[in-house]
Amino acid sequence: MLDKVKNVIVVLSGKGGVGKSTVSTQLSLALRKNGFKVGLLDIDLCGPSVPYLLGLEGRDIFQCDEGWVPVYTDESQTLAVMSIGFLLKNREDPVIWRGPKKTMMIRQFLTDVRWDELDYLIIDTPPGTSDEHITVMECLKEVGCHGAIIVTTPQEVALDDVRKEITFCKKTGINILGIVENMSGFVCPHCTSCTNIFSSNGGVSLATYAQVPHLGTLPIDPRVGVLAGTTTSVLDELPDSTTAEVLTHLVEKLKTMLVS
């Protein structure tokens, strides 16, 4: 039930391990910090990370007449979260399902969750261009998707797979809002200088290739990693960091691109 949601944004990448879930959670927290009501939907069925990243593991979800009630991170209910992780008894339990069952669960997540009025719904997806992605795109076409943010790392091995994701978006008619380059450089936790331990500017070149906006470059910052397991925004904890600067810029870009 997405009729009360103003903006639906999908976070995608053709490559696993590039930090989609971290970007999704910190973007959601940054939007909340800016006064928006936000929903975060984790549809990575085989590797749900959002409950862990926000310290919500073990929380229960309930059903009402309107569908599943999401988990709220605060009493004012400004950030609502839904993930298959809430349905698993143990974090180590694997999800061993065939395609049709995965498709059914994703459709339930997109149509049977009771989202209240939201300014933004951020959807964290699994890597690749599989059945899950096709199901998401088909469902979102029915209710409306305002665009996709594509996350990549600067290495060529990641860029190759992300190019396929860009082609997938174009073939399925999903508007690409832009590309975020993650894990670009390492921030020293002592002096905060940034060293390019891998290649750099891969996201910039990819954005130029795809003719879409480059939304920012995020470094590897151990101080950000410490925030995993909490609902603390980088904007609150590390306001002077590069990560906070990029997220602030990203929020401002979304405000100009989409309905506020």
UniProtKB/Swiss-Prot annotation:
Would you say which domain of life the source belongs to? Eukaryota
GO cellular-component terms in the record? cytosol
Annotated S-S bridges: none
In the UniProt record, does the keyword Nucleotide-binding occur? yes
Its GO biological process annotations read: iron-sulfur cluster assembly
Q: Fetch the CDD domains from UniProt.
A: Mrp_NBP35
Q: Which residues cross the membrane?
A: none
Q: Which residues bind ATP?
A: G14, K15, G16, G17, V18, G19, K20, S21
Q: Where in the cell is it found?
A: Cytoplasm
Q: Matching Gene3D superfamilies, A to Z?
A: P-loop containing nucleotide triphosphate hydrolases
Cofactor(s) the protein requires to work: [4Fe-4S] cluster
Cite the GO molecular-function annotations of the record: 4 iron, 4 sulfur cluster binding; ATP binding; ATP-dependent FeS chaperone activity; metal ion binding
Cite the entry's keywords alphabetically.
4Fe-4S, ATP-binding, Cytoplasm, Iron, Iron-sulfur, Metal-binding, Nucleotide-binding
Coiled coil spans: none
Cofactor details (free text): Binds 4 [4Fe-4S] clusters per heterotetramer. Contains two stable clusters in the N-termini of Nubp1 and two labile, bridging clusters between subunits of the Nubp1-Nubp2 heterotetramer.
Please give the Pfam families that the UniProt record associates with this protein. Answer: ParA (PF10609)
Q: Where does [4Fe-4S] cluster bind?
A: C188, C191
Q: Describe the protein's quaternary organization and the partners it interacts with.
A: Heterotetramer of 2 Nubp1 and 2 Nubp2 chains.
Q: What does this protein do?
A: Component of the cytosolic iron-sulfur (Fe/S) protein assembly (CIA) machinery. Required for maturation of extramitochondrial Fe-S proteins. The Nubp1-Nubp2 heterotetramer forms a Fe-S scaffold complex, mediating the de novo assembly of an Fe-S cluster and its transfer to target apoproteins.
Q: Which family does it belong to?
A: Belongs to the Mrp/NBP35 ATP-binding proteins family. NUBP2/CFD1 subfamily.
Q: In its UniProt entry, what is this protein called? A: Cytosolic Fe-S cluster assembly factor Nubp2 homolog
Natural source organism: Drosophila sechellia (Fruit fly)
- What is the gene called? Nubp2
